[in-house]
């Protein structure tokens, strides 16, 4: 573990929270937090606060990127990620969706995993800005830190 390389994919916190809130998860102690936007945004903040705290405390070797930047140039981001991992470039990574179709992924978004990367979920929060507005103060520190307006 001390030499583990950590990969963190960021996404606009508003889109993350909205996506979790709108997902039909099987309820358990964690997923019950996604039944309303208030608890969803508070859980997001708690998790991201933990990440920031332990990254600094443990001096974790992390590759942090924004989903939106990946969408803009998947090959460049994949090259940077493989370099971070000390792995040679392999163009097969760009065909991840073809490989995923041959395997089972235990995720609520399985259908999306088997598709080429797409932009349609970026900025989806704008359609729900009014509903998210009461929770902006919870997300604001992360919006600023991660470069979202």
Task: For every predicted segment, state its role.
Residues 2-21:
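Conserved phosphate-donor/acceptor-positioning beta-strand/loop module used by diverse small-molecule
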